[in-house]
């Protein structure tokens, strides 16, 4: 029996395992739709999205419409006529004309346990809020923001040492495995469909710069979770002598401490102690504005930072 034809829509690295698992398992990818190339770096050279690079290596046709409602794209969609559309971190909301097109519908790989953490940045906010469990949901797409019925869902614990980068990669691979199971169920016309419980929903909006600002009066666990939820990118930050200091790794020690919030204490084997609301945050990896990321011991060799200096 011939496998179903799939139109794949995705853009960043998160989507790569999902595309790759479909290709490896012999599913015909009619085309890949991804965001346009964007200028990056100091030279502002155009850089292709990771999914475009992967699709080109597989010799899959790539479409980069300026907008998903572009009439030219809709014409191509009619010509391609896929059985199923698979979406993984595409970056645009799909209109009803696209959602209604494929006979098997549109499904999305979402890195949270829906209905919790609907939105653009679920992995970041899951960590920032100190959750100990998360997962991946394969959902049928509708016109809402991650509100469609659930096809499959898998839960996984979050170890305390995992940051955004580690959890991102783990969920992208978990999502790919779950996607393959979902596609096979759809192919066999055995896919379940369970409505989300809207009363349990929460949102994970797109990150803003101020979401990375460390408030030293907060509890150490709150600060440590913000740091891990934004590491390695975009990075939680504070200020030192008017310049941005990004913090990528830190630990929290809850104890009664002297000094005001943000006050620099001593350097220990674990890192540099900074006073917070209910203890110390111990800085381990940092990056000064316009400098490279480094461990805090190397940083202190190049920056004179005396005890009593206040960050923020």
UniProtKB/Swiss-Prot annotation:
Pfam families per UniProt: Formyl_trans_C, Formyl_trans_N
The scientific name of the source species is Syntrophus aciditrophicus (strain SB)
InterPro entries on file: Fmt, Formyl_trans_C, Formyl_trans_C_sf, Formyl_transf_N, Formyl_transf_N_sf, Formyl_transferase-like_C_sf, GART_AS, Met-tRNA-FMT_C
- What is the protein's name according to its record? Methionyl-tRNA formyltransferase
State if Transferase is listed as a keyword: yes
Give the NCBIfam families listed for this entry.
fmt
Q: Which catalysed reactions does the entry list for this protein?
A: L-methionyl-tRNA(fMet) + (6R)-10-formyltetrahydrofolate = N-formyl-L-methionyl-tRNA(fMet) + (6S)-5,6,7,8-tetrahydrofolate + H(+)
Functional note: Attaches a formyl group to the free amino group of methionyl-tRNA(fMet). The formyl group appears to play a dual role in the initiator identity of N-formylmethionyl-tRNA by promoting its recognition by IF2 and preventing the misappropriation of this tRNA by the elongation apparatus.
Give the binding site residues for (6S)-5,6,7,8-tetrahydrofolate. 112-115
Question: GO cellular component terms?
Answer: cytosol
Which EC number applies? 2.1.2.9
- The top EC class is transferase
Q: Specify the taxonomic lineage.
A: Bacteria, Pseudomonadati, Thermodesulfobacteriota, Syntrophia, Syntrophales
Concerning its family, UniProt says: Belongs to the Fmt family.
**Superkingdom to which the source organism belongs:** Bacteria
| Keyword line | Protein biosynthesis, Transferase
Q: Say if the entry is tagged with keyword Transferase.
A: yes
Q: Name one GO molecular function term.
A: methionyl-tRNA formyltransferase activity
